[in-house]
């Protein structure tokens, strides 16, 4: 159709659209509704981090118009004698692009920048958003030396110095969280432990562009950990954890007996309840990292548990 409106997109979008629209559509819709508070009454909605509110109801039908023109790295087009450059800049998604209009010195960056710390993981469920790819993309946008920065969410920023400040703070914040997470990963810390360690330095924590309106640094630490080395924390206790129901039953028995954690750990070990012994030993070590009794219990319980998991 000659009158069809052209829709430009980076080629990775096809896989991403099909994945969300088909493979994981039911759970993504459910978790997205929770993330954005869609079921909440209007008076309970404060904001949604990067906007006021998202309104969807049962009477509305969601649709999708697919792109008509795909590109890989970059594409230059002309519309009404206006030059427009499209470039692939992976960040919040791996199909992200910017729209650069040289004549206007304006760059539209999609969701690779907004007035909130970069959403390195969305709790509705997203695949790994590579922090260093995002940083590299922001550095490429900085090289444009734009006069106007136009995000998809939140207000535009004008003035080259203001744009540079915003983009620099943004990339520095992302890289700091990434680098510190990697540092502690290589020290052997678990995600729970790393979350307690990674805090932004004062000059970044006070930046107006890095406030935690849309997500939290703790979830970004966990996402980075998982993105680099997967779900396993490195603690043998996490290989075959008790179910919530099993743990609840054991805690109830423990409360009825009014035993100390250390005594209960010894009982579990002697009864061959090695997983429970591991988890109790972890509690003791969390209270006192020098607890030799707990370390010995964990070492003894770890041996039989290790035989149940083939590497």
What are these regions (language model features)?
Residues 1-67, 72, 76:
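Active-site HxH/HxHxD metal-binding segment of metal-dependent hydrolases
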Residues 65, 74-78, 83-187:
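Metallo-beta-lactamase
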């Amino acid at each position: 159709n000659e009158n069809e409106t052209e829709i430009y997109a980076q080629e990775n979008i096809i896989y991403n659209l099909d994945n969300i629209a088909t493979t994981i559509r039911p759970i993504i819709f459910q978790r997205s509704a929770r993330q954005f508070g869609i079921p909440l009454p209007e008076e309970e909605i404060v904001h949604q981090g990067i906007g006021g509110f998202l309104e969807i109801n049962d009477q509305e039908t969601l649709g999708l118009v697919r792109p008509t023109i795909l590109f890989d790295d970059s594409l230059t087009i002309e519309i009404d004698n206006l030059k427009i450059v499209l470039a692939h800049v992976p960040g919040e998604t791996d199909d992200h692009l910017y729209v650069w209009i040289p004549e206007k010195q304006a760059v539209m960056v999609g969701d690779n920048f907004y007035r909130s710390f970069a959403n390195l993981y969305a709790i509705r469920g997203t695949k790994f958003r590579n922090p260093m790819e995002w940083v590299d993309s922001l550095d490429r946008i900085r090289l444009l030396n734009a006069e106007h920065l136009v995000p998809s969410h939140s207000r535009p920023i004008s003035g080259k110095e203001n744009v540079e400040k915003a983009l620099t703070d943004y990339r520095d914040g992302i890289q700091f969280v990434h680098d510190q997470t990697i540092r502690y990963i290589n020290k052997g810390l678990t995600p729970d432990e790393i979350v307690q360690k990674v805090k932004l330095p004062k000059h970044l924590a006070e930046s107006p562009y890095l406030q935690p309106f849309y997500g939290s640094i703790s979830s970004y630490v966990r996402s980075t950990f998982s993105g680099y080395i997967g779900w396993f924390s490195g603690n043998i206790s996490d290989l075959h954890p008790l179910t919530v129901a099993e743990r609840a039953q054991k805690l109830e028995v423990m409360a009825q007996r009014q035993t100390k954690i250390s005594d209960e750990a010894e009982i579990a070990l002697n009864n061959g309840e090695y997983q429970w012994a591991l988890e109790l030993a972890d509690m003791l070590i969390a209270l006192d990292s020098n607890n030799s009794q707990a370390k010995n219990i964990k070492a003894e319980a770890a041996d039989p548990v290790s035989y149940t998991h083939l590497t």
